[in-house]
């Protein structure tokens, strides 16, 4: 079964709820429904925007989906500032990003924490987008493939094959995020192919063949076509370009195999 590409727009800490509504409307207007047969498109807004996005998506019966940028490892309770998976599920979220390099870097999240978050997401029927990726020093040392596989193993440790089948993996080389530097399509394929081979070891070839592996890091309408043409790159986790409705729609159309809207 061919894997359907996924284009997920990570808005990071940008846009209030009114701006969120305007952007989703723009994407929906710019990307006709026919494209959604060939590509899944998701937006990942800040927590405070999710209810507004939900109302718009459900009210207008839009085909794009949405998710959250993080989730708590806890079910509920005295954890000030935390947001639980059950709350996100109630808001109709499909996806939740876990282990993004900015969370790992600024909030010191390790693989065990990322695993805990992925488990909570799965418990509540959410699809975790598990992020892994190396810094420039690792890339220059030439140990990037093993580094990523180690992160992958740590972030999926103990999950059953059935659980791994419900996960999306995002490979984001840290040196390419927001820097304008993009890993070449061959670089992306090298690591994404290694990720799929490792998934086959962890969960069997059948599961590995169905898990979507995304590339993230300065993805835009100019480079997405070459990236998703790689055999093991099944879409993209898009940052800055996802804040521009027209570009995000164009990017999604390219991932669907065109023509441009």
Swiss-Prot record:
<dbReference type="GO" id="GO:0004807">
    <property type="term" value="F:triose-phosphate isomerase activity"/>
</dbReference>
<dbReference type="InterPro" id="IPR013785">
    <property type="entry name" value="Aldolase_TIM"/>
</dbReference>
<comment type="pathway">
    <text>Carbohydrate biosynthesis; gluconeogenesis.</text>
</comment>
<dbReference type="InterPro" id="IPR035990">
    <property type="entry name" value="TIM_sf"/>
</dbReference>
<feature type="binding site">
    <location>
        <position position="218"/>
    </location>
    <ligand>
        <name>substrate</name>
    </ligand>
</feature>
<keyword id="KW-0312">Gluconeogenesis</keyword>
<protein>
    <recommendedName>
        <fullName>Triosephosphate isomerase</fullName>
        <ecNumber>5.3.1.1</ecNumber>
    </recommendedName>
</protein>
<feature type="active site" description="Proton acceptor">
    <location>
        <position position="172"/>
    </location>
</feature>
<keyword id="KW-0324">Glycolysis</keyword>
<feature type="binding site">
    <location>
        <begin position="239"/>
        <end position="240"/>
    </location>
    <ligand>
        <name>substrate</name>
    </ligand>
</feature>
<feature type="active site" description="Electrophile">
    <location>
        <position position="100"/>
    </location>
</feature>
<dbReference type="GO" id="GO:0046166">
    <property type="term" value="P:glyceraldehyde-3-phosphate biosynthetic process"/>
</dbReference>
<comment type="pathway">
    <text>Carbohydrate degradation; glycolysis; D-glyceraldehyde 3-phosphate from glycerone phosphate: step 1/1.</text>
</comment>
<dbReference type="GO" id="GO:0006094">
    <property type="term" value="P:gluconeogenesis"/>
</dbReference>
<dbReference type="GO" id="GO:0019563">
    <property type="term" value="P:glycerol catabolic process"/>
</dbReference>
<comment type="similarity">
    <text>Belongs to the triosephosphate isomerase family.</text>
</comment>
<keyword id="KW-0413">Isomerase</keyword>
<feature type="binding site">
    <location>
        <position position="178"/>
    </location>
    <ligand>
        <name>substrate</name>
    </ligand>
</feature>
<comment type="function">
    <text>Involved in the gluconeogenesis. Catalyzes stereospecifically the conversion of dihydroxyacetone phosphate (DHAP) to D-glyceraldehyde-3-phosphate (G3P).</text>
</comment>
<dbReference type="GO" id="GO:0005829">
    <property type="term" value="C:cytosol"/>
</dbReference>
<dbReference type="InterPro" id="IPR000652">
    <property type="entry name" value="Triosephosphate_isomerase"/>
</dbReference>
<keyword id="KW-0963">Cytoplasm</keyword>
<feature type="binding site">
    <location>
        <begin position="10"/>
        <end position="12"/>
    </location>
    <ligand>
        <name>substrate</name>
    </ligand>
</feature>
<dbReference type="InterPro" id="IPR022896">
    <property type="entry name" value="TrioseP_Isoase_bac/euk"/>
</dbReference>
<comment type="subunit">
    <text>Homodimer.</text>
</comment>
<dbReference type="GO" id="GO:0006096">
    <property type="term" value="P:glycolytic process"/>
</dbReference>
<dbReference type="Pfam" id="PF00121">
    <property type="entry name" value="TIM"/>
</dbReference>
<dbReference type="InterPro" id="IPR020861">
    <property type="entry name" value="Triosephosphate_isomerase_AS"/>
</dbReference>
